[in-house]
Amino acid sequence: MNEHSEWNSKLTFLFAMIGATIGIGNIWRFSYVFYTNGGGSFFIPYIIAILVMGIPFLILEYGLGFKFKESFSKLLHDINPKFEIIAWMLVLFVFIVAIYYMVILSWDFIYFLNSFTFGWGNDPAAFFATSVGGSSDFGGIGSVILPTFIAIIILWALFWLVSNNDVDKGIGNISKVLMPLLFIIMSLILIYSFTLPGFELGLNTLLSPNWNALLDVNIWLAAFAQIIFSLSIGQAMIYTYATYLSEETRLIDNVFMVVLANSIYEIFVGLGIFSILGYMSVTSSIPITELISEGTSLIFVVLPEIFDVMGPVGRIIAPLLFLSILFAGFTSSLALFEPLLSSVCDKFNWSRRKGVTVLAIIACCGSLLFSTGISSYLVEVVDTFVNEFGILILIALQAIIFTRYVDVDELRDVLNKNSAIKVGKKWKFDLKYILPAMLIVMWIIGVGQLIYEVDLFKLGIYVLITFLVLGLSVFFTRLNPIHDKE
């Protein structure tokens, strides 16, 4: 970029980092993963995954961004020009996530507007299929869901207004407002949920431990997967935010605060959602196991049904919940957008304003492709492929490259300089050997699952995304090489 921005305060950076990590997945995925993988006993692999993978990799990204202060593509180019293509592949995959992420936010935005009057009617599932997210019925592939189409345009316009500013004035200021509000809203929902009849049933269902589950390797893999995507590690988002840091930042201390805030929030959400599910089970005599779900089914079908049962109180809780999802998702989308923006602006010497405008228009057009009658199904297919095939292996490659081609010992000194919490040689060993091994195993299992479940439509999407990302990565790598541009 022509100019290099900085966060104007440590608090601004902290809120921005929390906003980057807390997202939709914390709300609609964590509680389900927790419940289906041993309940209360899941805390053990969850905490170990944080200590072994989450914190060490975040510390690495903080250190790299703070030290080098350049775009992710330029960083890998400077390490070795052959590695630049890896950087472009990663930031492009993350950009694709930003594209469909905004589609999910558009669904939430529609539900937020309808939550004051329960506009989804008596059948939230039908409302979602016909007016919001469509279904897996390919008969709707040629149709456009107008509310989603309009909501996408509105959200990308709002996104442009925020991201178009200097990072501190745009991302920083909105994070300082939305993050405290996010925790306040979720705390209110949690407190209220504890007053509902049946909340004990929900909490017991969620927290009852299954100690035998700890012997299942899949439980441990689920914990590590949750941490990877909950903390957004290895996706160049954290690295890019860290490039805007000043010299006085306590890097490692900040990592621990971000991880703590992320975990507290998703645990709060899990407790609140299961308390509400317990209430629904008691009042409707439906077994709670039949209510438990994740993703779109939980947020856009099950919870609206519960809000209907709540009556007038539901008209307060529902808007608050959908607003919290909107806040969490919007700040995460800002972070998802930043790696490609930084790399493109650095590559072509664009101003931030030009980069944001060009990429936001492209992203908006991409999001609109998801507004057809198979919107939710398409999002699911793309999300699974991008994360399990694309991003996971690229995170492993980062760990391998950075621990072998960057002076990690020198980086450790930089990290320890202003931090009360220090890292030692075990941190380097973890990054160099344990993390890559874990990530490669997870990637192999994920690819195996993709192959097992593939059909002609999914295969077509996978091939299209692969060629698109590879083609653009080669194009960006060869066009106007970074080392020739001054």
Specify the residue positions occupied by each region the protein language model found.
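C-terminal membrane-solvent junction of multi-pass transporters and transport-like membrane proteins
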Residues: 348-360, 386-461
